[in-house]
A protein has these predicted regions:
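Generic beta-sheet signal
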Residues: 77-79, 152-153, 194
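Short, solvent-exposed loop/turn segments at secondary-structure boundaries
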Residues: 90, 162-166, 203-205
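Residues at the C-termini of beta-strands that transition into short coil/loop
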Residues: 8-10, 80, 195
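Active-site environment of divalent metal-dependent phosphoester hydrolases
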Residues: 34-36, 60-66, 83-86, 137-139, ...
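Catalytic core of the metallo-beta-lactamase
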Residues: 1-48, 52, 66, 106-176, ...
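Accessory terminal helices/loops
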Residues: 179, 183-190, 197-250
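Active-site HxH/HxHxD metal-binding segment of metal-dependent hydrolases
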Residues: 38-122, 215-218
Length: 250
């Protein structure tokens, strides 16, 4: 992927994505996770001869709104909904970071501004921000169509099952959000999930997620291999309950 760099954290296969604008600037998407890993990102940018000109947080969860002072004072964008929710729920949303980050890094987390439109403001090729409510309210995916690159946030993962938002009572909102990504996944040559590995077959990831959800909603057993991961057992059981609630609601 020319112009794209991806680092993977030791924690939960969390990805940090860097997009190079071709003019010496870099946009850092969802930098994570441990202090040494965060510090490595600006060092790597310096080694590439570029500087951070902007950040992007795909959604409000604590592992996607981190930052490092050496990245500088660049504007850090997210959806208006994410910015608004962090303004009123910052302490609750960021509380888990106390187990991982130093106080100065926690203070930097979640300092975001609302995107001025549906495209990322940068000097690179047009980058469309696709908003939906699967996984988290006002979640963003970023499609750089010229490059065929989809940065999908916590969607289209090879290691995580579909993970609805905490307040979802059925799978309906997740399915609707996933459908919002279909055209982007179909047009992209690469998808970069927030957890897991980038793929050159984005539609396979999309189809796997939709097949899993369809099976649960229809009351069929799913044979998705991600279910075999012990760390996914609790999430799978919760998804089965949401599917049952959806079926009972008609």
């Amino acid at each position: 992927m020319d112009g794209v760099w991806v680092a993977t954290s030791r924690r939960y296969s969390t990805t940090s994505t860097v997009l190079l604008d071709g003019s010496g600037g870099a946009v850092v998407v969802d930098p994570a996770w441990d202090p040494d890993e965060l510090a490595a990102i600006p060092r790597d940018l310096a080694a590439l001869g570029v500087r951070c000109v902007a950040g992007l947080a795909t959604h409000e969860h604590y592992d996607h709104v981190m930052w490092h002072p050496d990245l500088g004072p660049a504007e850090r964008w997210s959806s208006a909904g994410t910015v608004a929710h962090l303004a009123v729920e910052r302490d609750r949303l960021l509380e888990p970071l106390s187990s991982y980050l130093t106080p100065d890094l926690i203070d930097l987390a979640g300092r975001l501004s609302a995107l001025p439109g549906e495209h990322l403001p940068w000097d690179g090729p047009p980058a469309l921000c696709i908003e939906h409510d699967a996984h988290a309210p006002a979640h963003l995916a970023l499609l750089v169509e010229e490059w065929g690159v989809l940065v999908s946030g916590d969607m289209l993962s090879d290691v995580e099952l579909p993970m609805p938002a905490d307040d979802d009572v059925t799978l309906e909102r997740y399915v609707t959000g996933l459908e919002r990504l279909r055209d982007a996944a179909a047009s992209a040559r690469w998808a970069i999930p927030g957890h897991g590995t980038p793929t050159s077959r984005p539609m396979e990831r999309y189809d796997a997620d939709m097949r899993y959800l369809d099976d649960l909603i229809a009351g069929r057993p799913s044979h998705d291999p991600r279910i075999l991961d012990p760390e996914m057992a609790e999430l799978h059981e919760a998804n089965v309950r949401l599917a049952a609630a959806q079926a009972s609601s008609g």
